[in-house]
């Protein structure tokens, strides 16, 4: 399948550069995955579309301030490091700039020596393996010295670091935020609970591969990046109970979707406690096994994320919805507006 089938025209001014002042004031496009019907709403209207007995699945990963600026100990040359994946102990897979200056044995110093890293080898796609040394607690030092690794299409400086975290972020380890969750406030989540909507939490640590463009000409040639996920016994039991009682499982974001669909694929359609690495790639033709609805932002043209959404809601429906979003001047990407996709015609509003 040609990746150009997932292209659409997006004016640059529709790429949201900063978050809205209030999280929940974003717009919400409601798309019926079967009929293609569209409604234009605000995010707080999600209360009308979720019903007692439904379950929202939220990714409680927390974004690391994963971008570090340091100097080579021998020459003083500036080096930028982006943490991608913790391998074991203090060893990390990273991207470094300029990569040609960092060879095996190179020592990089951050924060006047508060944190040091030694290059122990190369990694995939031009990356470097670094081993860190420090006194104290690594994540506390990282919190002091690191910067949030905003996506490459965001050019503005983020004034409030917390705006690139969900209000329920808990498990540190992501190089990017699960952005569909950024629209929720604690008050909105409380209102959903009062309505009888269940909240279930999983963890999937988002890697920077989520921003990598598809370089192959056809979908089938593309290989997905792997990301670590975890679902507890408590969450699995809740999801199975919701299913048994006829409720819907609504994932917040493509990361929650990838987690549930990975587990269901690996366990004959069942949801159970599991941890591991997933490189699942969902595109048209994929049959969903776990979810009934999806809340997600508007994604990049020709990205694996728009392919996932097209697998769930039909490519023609999705591209029509995206063209409508452009026409109606919705905000796109990480700090942009949201979609809620499900079989709405069957449910109606309550």
Swiss-Prot record:
EC numbers on record: 2.4.99.17
GO cellular component: cytoplasm
UniProt KW keywords: Cytoplasm, Queuosine biosynthesis, S-adenosyl-L-methionine, Transferase
Pathway(s): tRNA modification; tRNA-queuosine biosynthesis
GO biological process terms held by the UniProt record: queuosine biosynthetic process; tRNA wobble guanine modification
Location within or outside the cell: Cytoplasm
Molecular function terms from GO: S-adenosylmethionine:tRNA ribosyltransferase-isomerase activity
Transmembrane region(s): none
Top EC class, one word: transferase
Catalytic activity: 7-aminomethyl-7-carbaguanosine(34) in tRNA + S-adenosyl-L-methionine = epoxyqueuosine(34) in tRNA + adenine + L-methionine + 2 H(+)
Subcellular location, principal: cytoplasm
Record's function text: Transfers and isomerizes the ribose moiety from AdoMet to the 7-aminomethyl group of 7-deazaguanine (preQ1-tRNA) to give epoxyqueuosine (oQ-tRNA).
Assembly, per entry: Monomer.
UniProt record similarity statement: Belongs to the QueA family.
UniProt-listed PANTHER family: S-ADENOSYLMETHIONINE:TRNA RIBOSYLTRANSFERASE-ISOMERASE (PTHR30307:SF0)
Name this protein carries in UniProt: S-adenosylmethionine:tRNA ribosyltransferase-isomerase
The organism of origin for this protein: Bacillus cereus (strain 03BB102)
Lineage: Bacteria, Bacillati, Bacillota, Bacilli, Bacillales
The gene coding this protein: queA
């Amino acid at each position: 399948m040609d990746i150009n089938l997932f292209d659409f025209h997006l004016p640059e001014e529709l790429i949201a550069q900063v978050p809205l002042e209030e999280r929940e004031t974003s717009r919400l496009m409601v798309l019926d995955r079967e009929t293609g019907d569209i409604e234009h709403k605000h995010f707080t209207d999600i209360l009308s579309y979720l019903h007692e007995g439904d379950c929202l699945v939220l990714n409680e990963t927390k974004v690391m301030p994963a971008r570090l600026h340091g100097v080579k100990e021998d020459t003083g040359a500036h080096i930028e490091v982006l943490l991608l994946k913790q391998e074991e102990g203090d060893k990390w897979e990273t991207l470094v700039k300029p990569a040609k200056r960092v060879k095996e044995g190179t020592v990089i110093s951050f924060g006047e020596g508060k944190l040091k890293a030694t290059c122990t080898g190369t990694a995939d796609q031009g990356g470097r393996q670094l081993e860190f040394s420090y006194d104290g607690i690594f994540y506390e030092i990282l919190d002091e010295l690191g910067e949030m690794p905003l996506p490459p299409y965001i050019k503005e400086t983020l004034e409030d670091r917390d705006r690139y975290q969900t209000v329920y972020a808990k498990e540190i380890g992501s190089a990017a935020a699960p952005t569909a969750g950024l629209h929720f406030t604690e008050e909105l989540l409380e209102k959903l609970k009062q309505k009888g909507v269940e909240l279930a939490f999983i963890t999937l640590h988002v890697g920077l591969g989520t921003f990598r463009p598809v370089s192959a000409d056809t979908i089938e040639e593309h290989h997905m990046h792997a990301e670590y996920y975890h679902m507890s016994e408590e969450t699995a039991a809740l999801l199975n109970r919701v299913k048994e009682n006829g409720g819907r499982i609504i994932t917040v974001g493509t990361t929650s979707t990838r987690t549930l669909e990975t587990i269901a694929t690996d366990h004959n359609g069942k949801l159970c406690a599991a941890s591991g690495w997933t490189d699942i790639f969902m595109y048209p033709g994929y049959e969903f096994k776990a979810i009934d609805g999806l809340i997600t932002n508007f994604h990049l043209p020709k990205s694996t994320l728009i392919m996932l959404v097209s697998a769930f809601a039909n490519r023609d429906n999705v591209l029509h919805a995206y063209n409508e979003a452009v026409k109606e001047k919705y905000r796109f990407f990480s700090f942009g507006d949201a979609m809620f996709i499900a079989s709405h015609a069957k449910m109606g509003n309550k």
